Curated annotation (Swiss-Prot):
InterPro entries membership: WW_dom (IPR001202), WW_dom_sf (IPR036020)
Compositionally biased residues, Gly residues: 205-215, 223-273
CDD domains documented for this protein: WW
Region of interest: Disordered: 191-273
A GO cellular-component term linked to this record: nucleus
Protein name (record): WW domain-containing protein C660.06
One Pfam family of this chain: WW
Residues covered by the WW domain: 8-44
């Protein structure tokens, strides 16, 4: 199966491959010892034009919105133009009687040339003379079709991400709980730090994992987790509070991990005795 790839605007050794299902590119560092595909471009704010005949997801949304706006705008414009046709004709007739020569005797016959002397050199047209249109601001892909393709990047499912963070939190809580217990019986362990990453852009990603649970201590409960891992739209929640202690519960979690649109909530404090 042939795929579309390009190296336009990428560092040496990198290649971008078009994913027709998601309507976007993913990127591979072919110079790495173990090349791994990724959705994030290696260059910040890189904008590649889609392959010929293809449409990106964001562009499709843009076109639909603007087609609707254009239809409404043109209808209103045409109605106003028809209503004012006579007035415009009268104004144009009077304007023709007053020539520009009275103000600028040396004005060229083609006034556009005076204001836009380099218009011909800067016109954004294709080889056939047609306007480049919507993608004129994007980097030309200058790509090629090849049979040497890569598989799209995989990502951790949301449920698996949450369970993974919770498991990591439990392990960290147990290990650090033993450490603090042997240093003066002052508390249980800390929660976990883990969580899954988001899915491919521009769609939603997975949710971050949970922070760990705090352990029990002799004089003070353990602290809650330090938050879940990052997610596409929301980080995982913080730990669920410290375990009970001799003289007071541990602190709650210190906040969820970062997300595309907001971190998760913090944890809740444990009970005191």
């Amino acid at each position: 199966m042939s795929v579309y790839q390009t190296r336009e605007g990428l560092p040496s050794g990198w290649v971008a491959q078009w994913d027709a299902e998601y309507g976007t590119y993913f990127y591979v560092n072919e110079s790495a010892q173990n090349p791994q595909p990724q959705w994030e471009p290696p260059v910040e704010n890189l904008k590649l034009a889609p392959p010929p005949g293809a449409t990106s997801v964001n562009t499709a949304v843009y076109n639909n919105n603007n087609n609707t706006s254009a239809a409404n705008t043109n209808a209103a414009y045409n109605a106003n133009t028809a209503a004012n046709a006579n007035a415009n004709t009268a104004t144009t007739t009077n304007a023709a009687a007053t020539t520009s020569a009275a103000y600028n005797p040396n004005a060229p016959a083609n006034t556009n040339a005076a204001y836009y002397p380099n218009a011909a050199a800067t016109t954004t047209t294709n080889a056939d003379g047609s306007d480049k249109g919507l993608f004129s601001g994007l980097t030309s892909s200058n790509g090629y079709t090849t049979g040497n393709s890569y598989s799209r990047p995989s990502y951790v499912a949301p449920v698996a991400a949450g369970l993974g963070g919770l498991a990591l939190g439990g392990l960290a809580s147990h290990a650090l709980g033993n450490l603090f217990h042997h240093r003066g019986h002052n508390g249980g362990g800390f929660g976990g730090f883990g969580g899954g990453s988001g899915g491919p852009p521009p769609g939603p990603g997975g949710f971050g994992g949970f922070g760990g649970f705090g352990g029990e201590g002799h004089h003070h409960g353990g602290h809650g987790g330090f938050g879940g891992g990052p997610g596409g739209f929301e980080g995982g929640p913080g730990g669920f509070g410290g375990g009970p202690g001799g003289f007071g519960g541990g602190l709650g979690g210190f906040g969820g991990g970062p997300g595309g649109f907001g971190g998760g909530p913090g944890g809740h404090g444990g009970p005191g005795w």
